[in-house]
């Protein structure tokens, strides 16, 4: 297993082992976030990151991800192959070091990789530690090498198993069911969303996802490939919105040795949608690259608008927010040594990145505005309208602030509050309609459960201007009941959760089409105006039963058609089925037993796996554009629960 060790060559000596991995199995959440669905998918991303690092270094352009029938998963690339030579310090093959030492990998060696997504993660060794079985196969220097592992430990030494013309690495793993006790079943859409994102962020590479599960496995799979990168990404994200200008404004370059890519487009909506990435990592909490983008955008557009004289008649100052209304933008930077901060370590802290992005955006926009004066005028007109709407919205928002319980106003009259004042213990149910609200009030545990009835369908915030949102009585009641305010020391628009009164906010609607629509309206509001509640894990959806199956003295609830059929078969002839179309059809005891009792109920926690994809879906379902919505409904009709 000898390897030539010249500078800039990826070899056994490029691999640096930082620490042991005994810890991983005992404290998996420290390494992958959690051991639920999100943590399970994080395993895949860690392995794919290795292949993406090879692509960033210019050595790989094809990656294949296969969900196997036995719930294992395979990642294959056509890179150089992980080095297999003997590691000087460790005395074993470099492949074994990479696979069994936490933090080991070429990503810590600057001669092998200039930038790396893997730096943020914990490497393929953590995946190995959390897998009941793993196999690594390496195609390198005309030979095939392989090694297998059980729960992070090598079963045998790295062995040569033949000759090959290929290069690359294949890793297959099966998550350990003693650690991932909830599920080891991969979600196709979750993986597809991330792989699509990676294809857009790394134009030119091909990423294929194959699912071999089920009766009709698709061996061809789905191919993600982008020639235009962020330009295509932004068109995909904004496909369901009406464009304000035809062009995507984009740039790709380097400032102070920091590669910067930006794409942006204006639409007719009232929402700001900024997506930022560092070394392919989605930085949900933003950071210096995003603040640099905002500064460059605001200063350049303000300078142009002032010079044009279009702002002369405005009676109030324009703010940075006004320049970003109706803007969808993606900022992607590559940083050699990223420093991550924030609650979830997804906020970039490198100060030098801010000026690099700000300068890049300023130059890009100056050129565009100069060459496209008609589009420039349309953008500035939109900014002026946004400023006027913000001025109106501020007054409405101040009304919301004044009405919050903590600032002297009273709680909404319809709120039936709970006795406890410990937010960690308290939960509030948002219930459609007064009749269902009455049943819920009777059925609840008054010590820790509050009920807020909502009158019919709340406002569709996707189509409404901001001041209309804050003027809406139902929405104002939600703000007041929850005790949240708008504005923190860092951000005047951010949600202030310091005085949040409930740590479980449960949407409880009828199990019919109308109920689903109301749930979606409420979720759209939370996503657009109270996203921090979702990101902090406070939003849940109740799951009331669809059926009650009875025979004689026996009765059982069913939450799906399949469950209903099983119960009918079990009960035999003479069983009767009651279909619950509304919460009001259940009495207080039934509602408590099935939907509100913490010991028996099922709550679905609302999370955001992929912000860009969530944004796209909400725009498509709740926005103005009808054709994409119709196409989605036709494609998904077979999964729908339709009442006729």
Regions found by a protein language model. Name each.
Residues 1-14, 21, 45, 53-55, ...:
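GHKL-family ATPase ATP-binding module
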Residues 388-407, 422-427, 438, 442-444, ...:
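C-terminal interaction appendages of subunits in large macromolecular complexes
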Residues 21, 28-29, 95, 587:
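Conserved activation segment
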Residues 87-88, 95:
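Short adenine-binding "F-helix/F-box" segment of the Bergerat
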